[in-house]
C-alpha cells in the first residue's frame, strides 16, 4: 500500500491477511508497540474514541475495551474519566503489557471472531483499531453488540485504509437494516498523524429495551 508507514512492525501491519499472521505479528510487536505507535507516530484514535464515548456515557458505566492491545485505549478511557474497565485481546504478550497500565479491573484472552462473552454483560464497548486487515472480520461487530446492553454504545475507531475497502461501511448499513443498532455519529479525523493516516470514529447505539 503506497501510503502505508514503512518503519518497524507498523510498516507491515497493513499487509496481514490471516489470523495466524496477525497473532504472530502482534506477539512480536508487544514490547515496542507503545513506542512505535503511541510515541513515534502520535496514535490519536484512543483519545478520540474515549472522547466519543464520554459524550454518550457515564463515567461509572462498565466498559469493555475490545482488542485492548497494550492498553493505550484503556489509558485514554481512564483519562476521560472511566473507571470500570475490562479489556480483552487475543495476544497474551499484549495483555501482559496492558496489565502493567493498572487501568483494567479484568483482562482476558478472547478471539472476537469466535466469541466474546455473556449477553448484555457491559454498558458499552470500544474497539480501537481492531477492525483492519488480517485482524477481525467486519461482521464480528455483531458480537461486540451482543455483549452490550440495549441502549449501550459501541465506539469503533478504524483507519482510512480499511474503511475505504468498503466492507465495514457495508456491515454498518446491514446492522442498521437488521434493526440491531443505529449509527449515532461518524467523525473523520486523525488516526496516526505521524504516519499521515486519517481515520473514522463511529458510535453505534444498540437497539432494544
Where are these regions (language model features)?
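Class I SAM-dependent methyltransferase SAM/SAH-binding core
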Residues: 64-66, 70-115
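Core SAM-dependent methyltransferase catalytic element
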Residues: 194-209
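N-terminal, positively charged/glycine-rich alpha-helical extensions of SAM-dependent methyltransferases
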Residues: 1-32
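Conserved beta-strand signature within the Rossmann-like core of class I S-adenosyl-L-methionine
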Residues: 151-159
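A short SAM/SAH-binding and catalytic strip from SAM-dependent methyltransferases
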Residues: 124-137
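A short acidic, Gly/Pro-enriched loop at the edge of an enzyme's catalytic core
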Residues: 116-125
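A short glycine-rich, Lys/Arg-flanked "PGG" loop and its adjoining helix->strand segment in the class I
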Residues: 139-150
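Conserved SAM-binding loop and adjacent beta-strand
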Residues: 34-50
Amino acid at each position: 500500500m503506497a501510503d502505508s508507514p514503512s518503519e518497524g512492525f507498523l510498516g507491515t501491519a497493513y499487509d496481514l491477511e490471516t489470523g495466524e499472521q496477525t497473532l504472530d505479528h502482534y506477539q512480536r510487536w508487544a514490547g515496542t508497540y507503545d513506542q512505535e505507535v503511541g510515541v513515534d507516530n502520535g496514535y490519536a484514535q484512543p483519545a478520540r474514541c474515549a472522547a466519543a464515548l464520554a459524550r454518550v456515557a457515564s463515567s461509572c458505566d462498565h466498559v469493555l475495551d475490545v482488542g485492548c492491545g497494550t492498553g493505550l485505549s484503556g489509558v485514554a478511557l481512564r483519562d476521560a474519566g472511566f473507571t470500570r474497565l475490562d479489556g480483552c485481546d487475543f495476544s497474551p504478550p499484549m495483555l501482559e503489557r496492558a496489565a502493567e497500565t493498572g487501568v483494567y479491573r479484568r483482562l482476558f484472552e478472547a478471539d472476537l471472531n469466535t466469541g466474546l462473552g455473556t449477553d448484555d454483560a457491559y454498558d458499552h464497548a470500544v474497539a480501537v483499531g481492531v477492525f483492519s486487515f488480517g485482524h477481525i472480520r467486519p461482521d464480528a461487530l455483531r458480537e461486540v453488540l451482543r455483549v452490550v446492553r440495549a441502549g449501550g454504545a459501541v465506539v469503533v475507531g478504524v483507519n482510512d485504509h480499511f474503511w475505504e475497502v468498503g466492507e465495514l461501511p457495508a456491515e454498518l448499513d446491514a446492522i442498521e437494516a437488521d434493526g440491531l443498532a443505529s449509527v449515532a455519529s461518524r467523525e473523520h479525523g486523525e488516526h496516526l498523524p505521524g504516519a499521515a493516516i486519517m481515520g473514522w470514529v463511529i458510535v453505534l447505539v444498540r437497539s432494544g429495551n
